[in-house]
Amino acid sequence: MTDRSQCTQSGRTMGAQSASQDLQSLDSWLTDRIVTITVGPEEKRWVVHEKLLVSQSDFFRNYFSEGHDEMKLPDDEPRLFALFIRWLYGTAFLPSGGTRNFRFLPPDGVSVSVRDYLGVYVLGGKFGIVGVRNAVLDVLYAYYGEGSGADEHRSPDMHDITYIFEHTTPDAPMRRFLVAHALFYLFSRGRRGAPLPLDWEQVLGRSAEVGYEMIRMLGEWNWVMGANAPRMTIKARTEFHERAPLPEPEVVKQEADDEADASPI
């Protein structure tokens, strides 16, 4: 009885200490200098706590460390930057060490689309922020499912896959994730005998890189003609997470990379 009481008291103490540390971090972030960021050709303005912003990104840290009060991002979309800001403050207000993580809302095609989230993924690459890219991967992982051989499998739009190939480097996990789901759709029981969607013809007819990546991934599955295909599922979502700081933004290579990561299933 005493041991249990002591364990309970210890847990409460640790929880209180964690909460206190979280509040101290928030006080530090939310009482610091405010900076302005204008986004898009219409120059939509956001006022952001500088310390919170630079704690996540060398892209912002290097700029604001020179004493600037305002940053202009004329080539980015305000809609996507708004989603990034939602993630930035959403993660700041979640307790550290807890079981909860910030989650984007599932795409509904109206208030937010798959393409919107892919745009945020690309934006995360520009800013060098792994966390927001992983958050995008998480919401799309839930949206597309695990691909466990169901009769129906939701396929990514091929135009979305092309968008990711055009705006990311060959080692981006999102490439493998989307290609794997496209292949799971191709071999789903519900699609058997049906023609391929129009977007497949439109994209694969002009994008050798996407087609090559699909064939390369199929080769890695090691299927044997005449043998039953094994039950297959998409790897755990954390297998698609990026854990190291992203490199400085650079011109995206368009050719396929023979050294890309292994099959995601």
Protein language model regions, located:
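N-terminal BTB/POZ boundary and linker segment
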Residues: M1-L52, R79, R86-R115, V252
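A positional/structural detector of protein chain ends, strongest at the extreme C-terminus
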Residues: T2-R4, A262-I265
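Phospho-regulated RS/SR low-complexity segments
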Residues: Q9, T13, A244-L246, D261
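Surface-exposed beta-strand-to-loop junctions
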Residues: T36-E42, R61-H68, R115, P156-D157
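Cytochrome P450 catalytic domain signature, combining two hallmark sequence patches
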Residues: S55-E70, F93-P95
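Post-BTB helical module
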Residues: R86, F93-R192
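Eukaryote-biased recognition of C-terminal alpha-helical segments
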Residues: L196-D257
